[in-house]
């Protein structure tokens, strides 16, 4: 049976419904969420192995996104949280396949500073920074880094960990938190809980 003109599958809303129900899109979304959860677990395991007081946020954004419990919004922010000197700082974990020049620069030089924004470290340089050792840093202008600003602004995080397949993680520390995370591990790799 035919449809009257203007009704049926040529309507934008009908096309959107079909697009939403596409099983391949559903599989892709599930796969992305699963890889994101696995990456969060790996970052959690790595940071706790360094002796840092990191804990997971339950449902990592699930309750916050639905807005079911507005009173818990601040407690449910970020993927991971770390407590230093009785203050909680947020860690956002992002696993991506996108290529960004500044990430590749950080991988090649070890550490770079996006002026007025954040510092990016490879894992070995990040550990040196946590222990208070000096590090060489390449200066970069804050241009074309909107994607990284979004990562920090998502939950107002102080630390963003970027993971890519077959590459080492990049740890991005917001300028406002540089003093907080610096020298929180002693020379033996033990956590030092700074008191303000």
Model-derived regions: residue spans:
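Catalytic phosphate/metal-binding cores of nucleic-acid and nucleotide-processing enzymes, i.e., regions
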Residues: 2-196
